[in-house]
């Protein structure tokens, strides 16, 4: 018996010897501690203390993945081999208003960091805007606005450019839907993202064609390798339209297989008729159901991941935009509002549209010797769009437009970081696309069937030394397009087109001091005319317009020069972006002043044309602390200011282009209280004011009405708190109101401003539950 006890004691001693203690020190690049950073390690969560430290007991020997997250900072991910020198220091890099970083992940001593010389601006705390559409969320960034078709459909605008000139990367995949229409909102659930950011430069070299205005990055969080089960629940309610939204996500790693992780996410939305300050907008209800799943395996030398998402939206189109005869149409333009309204309803009736978008992505990367990384990614997308119009008898239930767009893309790139200062990326992409108009609609499609093939190759060289970062790149693209259809007279039309272009970019940034950064970037981007611009000939049901294309249109090429100045001393933050952009063969549509009469009504004719264009403007984003004090909690009062101005006109005639955003200013006054203990961890109150000037730079001959909407002021307010309700569970509560004074106004870039006013007061209640 005594021998057995001795043996057990000996085994216990060896077991205790095999387990150690891990001490971590988490700080920022200024060597300041980050309190409250979340450490994910071996399936559990830990929080750093006020000194940025955390101690994890009973850590056995071996290699384990670790992940650290902190609001406003890039996630830190690595693999720790224990035992390790302690305390182990971890440096977090800030994301908000900082230069983007391209880092090769791994443990190779030759890997260096290269910061790119253009701005990637990140939306801070976008989950507080759950339930909003992507375009509206993006307007939090200076220089980004939206072009609307009524109150339910919106597209983002960057520096005056929108549609096919804005490239959206949905989880690193080029979003390929029917984005050519002003009434075709991006088929993306923004709640799939952990971070939404905007690149304002003409990023054609890295991402390919269509990025003249900029790039929108929809980035989900990295899969939680080595983490335990956790998730979040985000219910919300909006008074305008009585809109309810519910988003839920859950994620984790497979027990005992920490290198295998997964995530599931879904969103449900339902809203009824929206309202202006004084009347309802009938037939503006919408429904949405989305979900996504992701899984992946992470090893020391590489990672393989699969992602799938399904987006479904059904939304009605305002009755008042479809008018029966010419006299009524002209009268509506003069009155500017519907003559008759009906009681509130959740019903979705024709005219309406229904969209289903599938996205499947498979990606893998492998870490090569000496700091290289090889990445391959394949993506499949299918976009199904149906638009319903008012028709005779029971034909209203048959879609008047029924299109299926199928896209296959393949991207391969090799990224290498040298030991001293240099980095290189070389890659290529291939895309195959087919658009098919389903027969049986009884209506001539607004665009013909088409097929396209495109490929591109690029090279980017980076340089980083001391306080200097620089980058230069070159890319070649080729696109083949074959369109084939029948017009309303049963005459076949279409043809083959080939486009190719060489694009380049060069830029540099300099860290003048610990407070000041200056960067300048110039890039040439291009895009081929889309099929709708070449061959449109029919009623665009969702927009309520009769569109006419021009098959002689040429490719657009745009040269953009962007210069940024940033001052940030951790108290005062000022960022100024100034840009000039020359676009050759700029394509735009404008109202001709004529109308076309169909069975369903009378519609204004919009014609596509092109001219050389000159865009220029300034964006301002500033934050000024007014008061700051410490007692039982950290309290501060801040003033924030955002503004943007963009001008655009033809180079030769100096005429103005339609639908260019008017100058705007947004200012916020925010009081924030932070606590590290107790039930209430955060409390904040804010008030805001937005001013939009009247757009005076327009051509009356290219407008349906001879004047533009008056300038307007909107006010908003919000109050929020964050509760610690046990363990790692938190509950955020946010109450906010937009258009607080219920102002009646019209937005120049809303294509339905001819028929009705914009939205009235809207009160939101949002919850964010993390578990």
Go through each PLM region and give its residues.
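N-terminal periplasmic accessory domains that precede
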Residues: 87-91, 125, 134-138, 154-157, ...
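Flexible loop and strand-edge segments within Gram-negative outer membrane beta-barrel domains
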Residues: 271, 282-284, 288, 302-367, ...
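Short acidic/polar hinge/loop motifs at secondary-structure boundaries
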Residues: 57, 127, 173-201
């Amino acid at each position: 018996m005594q021998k057995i006890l001795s043996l057990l004691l000996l085994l216990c001693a060896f077991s205790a010897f095999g387990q150690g203690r891990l001490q971590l020190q988490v700080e920022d690049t200024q060597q300041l501690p980050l309190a409250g950073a979340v450490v994910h390690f071996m399936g559990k969560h830990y929080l750093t203390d006020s000194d940025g430290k955390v101690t994890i007991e009973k850590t056995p020997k071996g290699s384990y993945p670790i992940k650290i997250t902190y609001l406003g900072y890039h996630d830190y991910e690595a693999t720790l081999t224990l035992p390790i020198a302690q305390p182990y220091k971890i440096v977090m890099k800030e994301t908000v208003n900082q230069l983007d970083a391209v880092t090769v992940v791994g443990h190779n001593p030759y890997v260096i960091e290269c910061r790119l010389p253009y701005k990637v601006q990140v939306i801070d705390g976008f989950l507080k805007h759950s339930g909003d559409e992507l375009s509206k969320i993006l307007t939090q960034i200076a220089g980004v606005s939206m072009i609307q078709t009524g109150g339910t459909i919106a597209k983002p605008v960057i520096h005056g450019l929108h549609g096919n000139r804005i490239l959206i990367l949905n989880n690193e995949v080029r979003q390929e839907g029917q984005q050519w229409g002003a009434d075709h909102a991006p088929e993306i659930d923004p709640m799939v993202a952990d971070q939404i950011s905007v690149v304002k430069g003409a990023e054609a070299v890295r991402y390919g064609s269509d990025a003249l205005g900029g790039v929108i990055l929809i980035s989900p969080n990295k899969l939680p390798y080595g983490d335990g089960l956790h998730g979040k629940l985000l219910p919300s309610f909006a008074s305008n339209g009585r809109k309810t939204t519910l988003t839920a996500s859950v994620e984790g790693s497979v027990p005992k297989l920490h290198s295998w992780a997964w995530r599931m996410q879904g969103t449900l939305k339902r809203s009824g008729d929206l309202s202006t300050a004084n009347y309802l907008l009938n037939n503006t209800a919408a429904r949405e159901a989305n979900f996504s799943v992701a899984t992946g395996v992470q090893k020391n030398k590489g990672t393989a991941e699969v992602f799938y998402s399904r987006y479904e939206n059904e939304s009605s189109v305002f009755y008042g935009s479809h008018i029966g005869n010419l006299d009524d149409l002209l009268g509506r333009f003069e009155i500017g509002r519907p003559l008759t309204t009906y009681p509130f309803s959740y019903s979705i009736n024709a005219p309406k549209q229904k969209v289903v978008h599938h996205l499947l992505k498979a990606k893998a990367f492998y870490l090569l010797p000496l700091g290289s990384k090889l990445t391959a990614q394949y993506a499949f997308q299918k976009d199904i769009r149906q638009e319903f119009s008012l028709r005779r008898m029971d034909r209203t239930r048959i879609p008047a437009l029924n299109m299926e767009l199928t896209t296959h893309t393949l991207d391969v790139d090799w990224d290498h970081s040298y030991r001293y200062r240099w980095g290189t990326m070389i890659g290529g992409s291939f895309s195959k696309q087919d658009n098919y108009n389903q027969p049986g609609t009884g209506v001539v499609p607004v665009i013909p069937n088409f097929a396209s093939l495109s490929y591109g190759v690029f090279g980017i060289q980076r340089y980083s030394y001391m306080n200097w970062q620089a980058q230069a790149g070159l890319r070649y693209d080729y696109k083949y397009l074959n369109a084939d259809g029948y017009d309303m007279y049963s005459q076949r039309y279409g043809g083959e087109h080939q486009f190719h272009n060489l694009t380049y970019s060069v830029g540099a940034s300099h860290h003048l001091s610990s407070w000041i950064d200056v960067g300048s970037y110039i890039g040439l981007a291009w895009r081929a005319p889309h099929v709708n611009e070449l061959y449109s000939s029919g009623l665009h049901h969702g927009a309520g317009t009769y569109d006419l294309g021009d098959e002689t249109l040429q490719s657009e090429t745009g040269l953009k020069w962007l210069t940024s100045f940033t001052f940030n001393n951790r108290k005062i933050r000022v960022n100024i972006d100034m840009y000039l952009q020359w676009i050759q063969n700029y394509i735009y549509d404008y109202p001709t002043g004529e109308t076309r009469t169909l069975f369903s009504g009378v519609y204004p004719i919009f014609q596509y044309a092109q001219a050389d264009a000159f865009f220029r403007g300034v964006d301002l984003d500033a934050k000024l602390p007014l008061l700051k004090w410490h007692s039982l909690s950290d309290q501060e009062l801040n003033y924030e200011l955002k503004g943007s101005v963009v001008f655009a006109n033809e180079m030769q005639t100096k005429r103005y282009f339609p639908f260019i955003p008017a100058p705007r200013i947004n200012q916020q006054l925010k009081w924030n209280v932070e606590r590290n203990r107790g039930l209430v961890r955060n409390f904040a109150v804010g008030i805001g004011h937005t001013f939009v000037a009247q757009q005076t730079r327009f051509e009356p001959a290219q407008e349906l009405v001879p004047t533009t909407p008056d300038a307007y002021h909107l006010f908003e307010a919000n109050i929020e708190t964050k509760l610690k309700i046990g363990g790692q569970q938190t509950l955020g509560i946010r109450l906010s109101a937009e258009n607080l004074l219920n102002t009646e106004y019209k937005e120049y870039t809303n294509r339905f401003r001819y028929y009705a006013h914009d939205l009235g007061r809207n009160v939101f209640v949002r919850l964010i539950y993390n578990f």
